[in-house]
Amino acid sequence: MSLVAIGINHKTATVDLREKVAFSPDKIHDAMKSLAKCTKTGEAVIISTCNRTELYTNTGDEAEVIRWFEEYHQLSHEEVEPCLYKFEGQGVVKHLMRVSSGLDSLILGEPQILGQVKQSFAKAREAGSVAITMDRLFQNTFSVAKKVRTETEIGAAAVSVAFAAVSMAKHIFSSISSTKVLLIGAGETIELVARHLKDNGVDSMVVANRTLSRAEGMCDEFGATAITLEQIPDFLPKADIVISSTASPLPILGKGMVEKALKQRRHQPMLLVDIAVPRDIEAEVADLDDAFLYTVDDLQSIIEQNMASRREAAEQAEVIAENESHLFMEWVRSLESVDSIREYRTQSMAIKDELVERAINKLAQGGDSEQLLLELANKLTNKLIHAPTQALTAASRQGDLNSIGQLRSALGLDKN
């Protein structure tokens, strides 16, 4: 058997096609069982996220895996084939290690994908579609992803606006977990900011939004307080950090409002991060002594520097993935050799048992023991040397000196 993987991701397919080939969480368990039945080893793992759908199997039949994929999603070969990428053997191992380490992600080095791969593997275990090879492959991959995180700086620098905003706050405040944060807006970016803040131990968050119900929905997840935009002046004086991202055409925070809040704070410093376009916070706020205002342009320059750092770290990570994939394939080959040795020994023992049984029967019938012993030795020798003799003859006819040399070495003909 050999490892085979096929997939579609953000680089090869449109959102429309990615949606069509995605596996819903409630159906992926049965899908893995179904795919596993198509393989001779019964091993299959499916990874399905918003940016990729990938099938990992331990089978030698790539065409069968592709056929199953197309039939499951009721798509034609013409729709799928142009967007499909395929890997075999070591290519599968290296690709999975790259994916799990964030080297193949939309945002280079993003850590979320490792958790998604782990969830997929756990579901495959539940479905019973994992055996020795897939188990070893994924466990090794998780170790490699951890190694990439600890031995390179691929995850150290912020490369998203939301992450960069929180990273900046961490640099300014010695203990971000004890700060009070006001978030303005309730869109995807602010939700991501809230998640990063929560991960860094921030418990005191207020979310201000034009639509209160939208803010309340987000606050339920993060244990925050929801308010309307009109209530901002009441909550602003309590905020150590303000991060804003709305679609408002006009500024939400003016210099006067911030100045008044700073007076009430007795001029304790306030960090304001405006990641909206157009701006949510008037530029003049930066003129206030105790206000530290950063815009999306400031963050973008940080992100560009950090992305360069990540690309450098990614080169180191690629070397790790390459080396580790080689080591895994050595284990696979050793597994194959163990199976071959076991099969060869079983076959040889069966030949021996058959010939010995015949000799015993003839001996019981009064046969000459010396003659039977000689006959047994000759027949056993002929049976055991038959396959190597055929291999040597075939290699000789083809002029395959390399195979002849290997066979001579294996048979011990070159000793002494």
Curated annotation (Swiss-Prot):
Enzyme class: oxidoreductase
GO process annotations (BP): protoporphyrinogen IX biosynthetic process from glutamate
The entry's keywords: NADP, Oxidoreductase, Porphyrin biosynthesis
CDD domains named in the record: NAD_bind_Glutamyl_tRNA_reduct
Site (Important for activity): 95
Stated family: Belongs to the glutamyl-tRNA reductase family.
Complex and partners: Homodimer.
Comment on protein domains: Possesses an unusual extended V-shaped dimeric structure with each monomer consisting of three distinct domains arranged along a curved 'spinal' alpha-helix. The N-terminal catalytic domain specifically recognizes the glutamate moiety of the substrate. The second domain is the NADPH-binding domain, and the third C-terminal domain is responsible for dimerization.
Name the record gives this protein: Glutamyl-tRNA reductase
UniProt organism field: Shewanella woodyi (strain ATCC 51908 / MS32)
Chain's gene name: hemA
